[in-house]
Each structure stands twice: as C-alpha cells, then as structure tokens.
C-alpha cells in the first residue's frame, strides 16, 4: 500500500494498532452489554472478513493509508459489529421464547445451515439499509472541499460493508 503522508514510516504499525484497539473496544463493550464472554464472539466473527474486504478494496483502488483510512477502520468495525449484534439478538430472542440452542438445530423441518440463513435473511433488510445509508451519506463527504484526502474513509467503509 502507498502511504501518502509524511508519517509513512509509522503508518503501517499505527493501522495495526488502530485495528486491534477498535476490535478490543468493540469486544469489551459487547461483553459488558451481554454480560457474557461468549455472545460477543459470535457478534464479532464477521469483522475479519469485512476488514479483509476493506483492505483489498483500498489496495485495488490505490487508496493511501492515512488518518482518514484509520477512521474508516473504526467506522467499519462499528458497522460490522452492529450486524453481528442483530443476529445475536435474534438468537437470544429465540432462546427467550423457551427454546434451547439445540432446538434450533434439531428442528426436523429445517437444517442448521438453513436456520442460520433464515436469521441472516431476516436481518438483511437492516444491513442493506445501513449499507445504503453509509454509501449515500458519505457522498457529500467525498465531494466537498479536500475530497482527495478523505475518499479513503468512504472506499474503506463501502468495500468493507460490501464484503
């Protein structure tokens, strides 16, 4: 990747630190919210895929790593964790109805993969709305003054959400 700033030597390590700190803060906030150490694991499982897509998108587009890209990483962690939270909440509601975890996988009418797909399909509307709002909401950010500096945030967020 091309480091487009004067602090290019420190940019690679800073990006790694920002990613690790954002992931750690997201996990700890979710652990406090769910009062459990296992539920947040399910909520943050999609983060590596989103970050891989974001970094690949930035590499393909030739976006330099800057402070705006690092802000985009933090935004992406938050948006991807939100999608995981919605799926975990749906599963918790299923358990609150008196069903066990095994009930979801032992139902004769659906397979475990279908159940997971059902959860994702039900929640896809909210995820698609978040993607569209993030994509369209960033347009003024990318078309205003100094847009050449800030486009990295939008590329990173859109590519990460798309993956």
From Swiss-Prot:
The record's listing under SUPFAM superfamilies reads:
Multidrug efflux transporter AcrB transmembrane domain
Q: Name one GO molecular function term.
A: xenobiotic transmembrane transporter activity
Under InterPro entries, the record lists: Acrflvin-R
Family annotation (Gene3D superfamilies): Multidrug efflux transporter AcrB transmembrane domain (1.20.1640.10)
| Cellular-component GO terms for this entry | plasma membrane
One Pfam family this chain carries?
Answer: ACR_tran
Similarity comment text for this entry: To E.coli EnvD.
Name of the molecule in the record:
Uncharacterized 17.3 kDa protein in cblS 5'region
Protein source organism: Bacteroides uniformis
